[in-house]
């Protein structure tokens, strides 16, 4: 199995490139985001490879980071998602944004990808939420966000209502969870929704 290729970009197609490795041209399928990140024709490139072997063909899928490849693998484990849809998702969301969308349960962000409807978006969140911590370890900001989301969702009640209120005011889910988690730490367990919203808005105004 091929795990990594290092060579020279020979040409680009709509959803792939030809990578010349010592005179052998490998056709590698990529997400739109990966194709945009690659250097120009004639320049050196390195791709992490996922190899799919079928009875009638061998297909290579390339990624600029191992995290992107791992998300590609995880996404295909979900009913209704094949290689085409997985690449469409990775074309729309970079790995850190995908992890954030799953952690926040942001189905709208996921549904922006071609081929992802409400049901598939829901399955992505439900089935991959437990996998997000593995991707947050190397990203302190994302790790804090995941912890804040877990704290507000586990507590429920006033915290959850306060998050919902901030989202309704137009703040993003990540902003709302982070602000209300900070407000909750300051106000304590018995804080009312109104108090949390007030403190949360102060956090957002900093």
Curated annotation (Swiss-Prot):
The keyword DNA damage applies. One of its GO terms (molecular function) is ATP binding. Its main location: cytoplasm. Residues 154-206 are annotated as: Domain III. Residues 1-64 are annotated as: Domain I. Keywords: Cytoplasm, DNA damage, DNA recombination, DNA repair, DNA-binding. Residues 65-143 are annotated as: Domain II. It comes from the Bacteria. InterPro entries: DNA_helicase_Holl-junc_RuvA_I, Hlx-hairpin-Hlx_DNA-bd_motif, NA-bd_OB-fold, RuvA, RuvA_2-like, RuvA_C, RuvA_C_sf. GO terms for biological process: DNA recombination; DNA repair. One of its GO terms (cellular component) is Holliday junction resolvase complex. CDD domains: UBA_RuvA_C (cd14332). The keyword Transmembrane does not apply. It is found in: Cytoplasm. Residues 144-154 are annotated as: Flexible linker. Pfam families: HHH_5, RuvA_C, RuvA_N. Homotetramer. Forms an RuvA(8)-RuvB(12)-Holliday junction (HJ) complex. HJ DNA is sandwiched between 2 RuvA tetramers; dsDNA enters through RuvA and exits via RuvB. An RuvB hexamer assembles on each DNA strand where it exits the tetramer. Each RuvB hexamer is contacted by two RuvA subunits (via domain III) on 2 adjacent RuvB subunits; this complex drives branch migration. In the full resolvosome a probable DNA-RuvA(4)-RuvB(12)-RuvC(2) complex forms which resolves the HJ. The RuvA-RuvB-RuvC complex processes Holliday junction (HJ) DNA during genetic recombination and DNA repair, while the RuvA-RuvB complex plays an important role in the rescue of blocked DNA replication forks via replication fork reversal (RFR). RuvA specifically binds to HJ cruciform DNA, conferring on it an open structure. The RuvB hexamer acts as an ATP-dependent pump, pulling dsDNA into and through the RuvAB complex. HJ branch migration allows RuvC to scan DNA until it finds its consensus sequence, where it cleaves and resolves the cruciform DNA. Has three domains with a flexible linker between the domains II and III and assumes an 'L' shape. Domain III is highly mobile and contacts RuvB. Belongs to the RuvA family. This is Holliday junction branch migration complex subunit RuvA. It comes from Azorhizobium caulinodans (strain ATCC 43989 / DSM 5975 / JCM 20966 / LMG 6465 / NBRC 14845 / NCIMB 13405 / ORS 571).
């Amino acid at each position: 199995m091929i795990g990594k290729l290092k060579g020279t970009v020979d040409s680009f197609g709509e959803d792939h490139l030809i990578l010349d490795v010592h005179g052998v041209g490998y056709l590698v399928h990529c997400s739109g985001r990966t194709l945009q990140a690659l250097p120009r024709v004639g320049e050196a490139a390195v791709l992490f490879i996922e190899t799919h072997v079928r009875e009638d063909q061998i297909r290579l899928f390339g990624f600029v980071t191992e995290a992107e490849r791992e998300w590609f693998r995880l996404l295909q484990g979900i009913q209704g998602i094949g290689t085409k849809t997985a690449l469409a998702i990775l074309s729309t969301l970079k790995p850190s944004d995908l992890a954030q969308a799953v952690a926040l349960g942001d189905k709208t962000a996921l549904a922006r990808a071609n081929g992802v409807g409400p049901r598939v978006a829901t399955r992505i969140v439900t089935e991959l939420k437990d996998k997000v911590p593995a991707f947050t370890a190397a990203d302190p900001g994302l790790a804090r966000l995941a912890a804040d989301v877990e704290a507000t969702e586990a507590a429920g009640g006033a915290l959850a209502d306060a998050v919902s209120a901030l989202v309704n005011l137009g703040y993003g889910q990540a902003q709302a969870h982070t602000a209300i988690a900070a407000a909750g730490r300051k106000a304590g367990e018995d804080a009312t929704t109104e108090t949390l919203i007030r403190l949360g808005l102060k956090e957002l105004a900093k």
